[in-house]
């Protein structure tokens, strides 16, 4: 069985990590204090971190309220992005794609491009301090109107290759099925903007199939296809990456127990997978924790490490030069 020392020190790639769900208690406390709002560390720990027996997805999502208030200024955005990349680098994450919804950071008048550039500045600062490469995924939100989402994507497209590596669709799958967003992703496809889509987190395999039909190169979560061999084969044949987030899926009841987690099914089906935190603070987790959770469940073995690393790299949205750099970080090549 792989031990924690190996899991912590081996090179890793993380492709599914939300900025607002990964702000530390300490940074959130500081940024709120700068706004004149005082909280104790204990109060913030309770407000930001969801319990393992989280009663509902709604309860999980309310943990994002305070962090989002901190992401309304350039300074807050820079600080959150830099901190996240440094935390990831500390546990040997060599490539990190950070996702967030720029449209949620406009409350104090920042433009979409200013918001994205601020996050990129924080990430690039971290890159000068640690051995890590980063990219930004901008999230369109299912609950926002078409005009808001499309306008954000158009602004973000101007920064593709200048920090931005692709886009995503996040939010309530049940209330806003992926089929409602064909126009958005047709625009992204025509404008050569790579995309992943949160799909199959809340029980809908149809959303996964729709995402693939629209041209998604990766699927966020993908749990709902665990009982659909045909869909698993489609993902494997098309080399569609699946972004696994075990702890988060347990908390939001996407699966009832770790014993039901489909890692082994997906692995044996030949689906390219990455192992991710989703939200480091909300789920109180790290990449190391995620690997160990699957290891302790008897699913992940040390012999799989290189295959997962290379599959994650292949399905990342990094450009070729970055991929070559990250490829070279695997010690056995």
Tell where the protein language model's regions lie, with residue ranges.
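Conserved hydrophobic beta-strand within the GNAT/NAT acetyltransferase core sheet
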Residues: 195-197
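Acidic/histidine-rich helix-loop elements
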Residues: 200
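Metal-cofactor-binding active-site regions of metalloenzymes
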Residues: 1-193, 203-207, 213, 217-218, ...
């Amino acid at each position: 069985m792989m031990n924690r020392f190996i899991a912590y020190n081996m090179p890793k790639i993380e492709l599914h990590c939300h900025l607002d769900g990964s702000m530390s208690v300490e940074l959130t406390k500081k940024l709120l204090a700068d706004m004149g709002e005082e909280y104790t560390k204990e109060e913030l720990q309770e407000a930001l971190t969801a319990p393992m027996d989280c009663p509902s997805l709604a309860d999980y999502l309310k943990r994002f309220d305070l962090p989002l208030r901190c992401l309304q200024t350039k300074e807050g955005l820079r600080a959150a992005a830099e901190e996240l990349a440094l935390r990831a680098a500390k546990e040997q994450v060599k490539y990190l794609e950070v996702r967030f919804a720029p449209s949620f950071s406009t409350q104090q008048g920042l433009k979409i491009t200013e918001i994205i550039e601020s996050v990129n500045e924080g990430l690039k600062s971290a890159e000068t301090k640690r051995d890590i490469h980063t990219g930004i995924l901008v999230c369109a939100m299912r609950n926002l109107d078409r005009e808001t989402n499309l306008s954000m994507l158009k602004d973000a497209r101007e920064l593709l290759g200048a920090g931005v590596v692709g886009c995503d669709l996040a939010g309530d799958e049940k209330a806003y099925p992926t089929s409602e967003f064909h126009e958005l992703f047709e625009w992204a496809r025509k404008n050569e903007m790579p995309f992943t889509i949160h799909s199959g987190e809340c029980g809908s395999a149809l959303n996964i199939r729709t995402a693939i039909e629209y041209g998604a190169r990766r699927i966020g979560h993908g749990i709902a296809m665990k009982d659909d061999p045909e869909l698993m084969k489609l993902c494997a044949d098309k080399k569609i990456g699946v972004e696994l987030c075990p702890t988060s899926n347990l908390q939001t009841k996407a699966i009832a127990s770790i014993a039901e987690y489909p890692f082994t099914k997906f692995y044996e089906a030949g689906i390219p997978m990455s192992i991710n935190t989703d939200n480091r603070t909300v789920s109180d987790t790290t990449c190391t924790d995620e690997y160990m959770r699957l290891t302790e469940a008897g699913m992940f073995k040390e012999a799989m490490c290189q295959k997962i690393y290379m599959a994650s790299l292949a399905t990342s949205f990094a450009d070729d030069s970055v991929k070559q750099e990250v490829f070279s970080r695997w010690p056995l090549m």
